[in-house]
């Protein structure tokens, strides 16, 4: 697509949203609590901040403000305010460890962009299934495209199930005053995925082209039971237990992948 000559600022808002899920089986309350503590530490606020800062670098955004927080009993949040223009350090809010704004300037620019992540560890009360979910949103204005960080984020989070939504909102005008409701070609989020990611996941799309909304759901193809057991040795399982846990995990993953409750099905 030929580069548009715009009149003023590019007012299109491009938002890339992820829901990523990590599934595990833990057969005791202690094991489930240990898993939640483990996964909570794996995705703590410090590590997530590093991932999001790298995301900023990949999409060519400048960091204006960073806030991160770990929660009790579990969960973490990170929010980064970014822009596409070079940074004027005198106008940047710097938050210290006491969550106090050091600089006197308060940012209130509606044309700025943001990247945020929130985590949600949880477990089933009876079955032993544990699920970790992280929500990530990369929302940009101007020429910055969040799609440039798509492959990096998928690789960094190494998830069993991923749901992705990309949408473009608003419009921008060219030098002739004509409105443009999107400024690049796309018919699927999969257009921007690397070959190795496409080979790793089963995927399907639900797209609303007239609204510039694109949705892709992903399920990891490779299933090895030992990768889903927490504090359990697969060799210690009976044949019946082995089959039961596989069916339980497969049901959980399929329900999340399709977004609805289903009857117990066997993994083929």
UniProtKB/Swiss-Prot annotation:
Highest taxon above the source species: Bacteria
| Taxonomic source organism | Buchnera aphidicola subsp. Schizaphis graminum (strain Sg)
What protein name applies here?
Answer: S-adenosylmethionine decarboxylase proenzyme
State any GO CC term: cytosol
Catalytic activity, as annotated? S-adenosyl-L-methionine + H(+) = S-adenosyl 3-(methylsulfanyl)propylamine + CO2
Leader sequence range is none
Q: Where is this site: Cleavage (non-hydrolytic)?
A: 112-113
Kindly give the InterPro entries that the UniProt entry links to this protein: AdoMetDC_fam_prok (IPR003826), S-AdoMet_deCO2ase_bac (IPR009165), S-AdoMet_deCO2ase_core (IPR016067)
Q: Which SUPFAM superfamilies match?
A: S-adenosylmethionine decarboxylase
Q: How is the cofactor bound?
A: Binds 1 pyruvoyl group covalently per subunit.
* Active site: residue positions: 113 (schiff-base intermediate with substrate), 118 (proton acceptor), 141 (proton donor)
GO molecular function term, any single one: adenosylmethionine decarboxylase activity
Keywords from the UniProt entry:
Autocatalytic cleavage, Decarboxylase, Lyase, Polyamine biosynthesis, Pyruvate, S-adenosyl-L-methionine, Schiff base, Spermidine biosynthesis, Zymogen
Instruction: Please describe the post-translational modifications of this protein.
Output: Is synthesized initially as an inactive proenzyme. Formation of the active enzyme involves a self-maturation process in which the active site pyruvoyl group is generated from an internal serine residue via an autocatalytic post-translational modification. Two non-identical subunits are generated from the proenzyme in this reaction, and the pyruvate is formed at the N-terminus of the alpha chain, which is derived from the carboxyl end of the proenzyme.
Q: Does the keyword Amino-acid biosynthesis apply?
A: no
- Protein purpose: Catalyzes the decarboxylation of S-adenosylmethionine to S-adenosylmethioninamine (dcAdoMet), the propylamine donor required for the synthesis of the polyamines spermine and spermidine from the diamine putrescine.
Q: What is its EC number?
A: 4.1.1.50
What does this protein need as cofactor?
pyruvate
Its lineage opens with: Bacteria, Pseudomonadati, Pseudomonadota, Gammaproteobacteria, Enterobacterales
Cite the annotated pathway.
Answer: Amine and polyamine biosynthesis; S-adenosylmethioninamine biosynthesis; S-adenosylmethioninamine from S-adenosyl-L-methionine: step 1/1
What does the subunit comment say? Heterooctamer of four alpha and four beta chains arranged as a tetramer of alpha/beta heterodimers.
- Return the similarity comment: Belongs to the prokaryotic AdoMetDC family. Type 2 subfamily.
Query: Which residues in this protein are found as Pyruvic acid (Ser)?
Result: 113
Q: What class of enzyme is it?
A: lyase
* GO BP of this protein: spermidine biosynthetic process
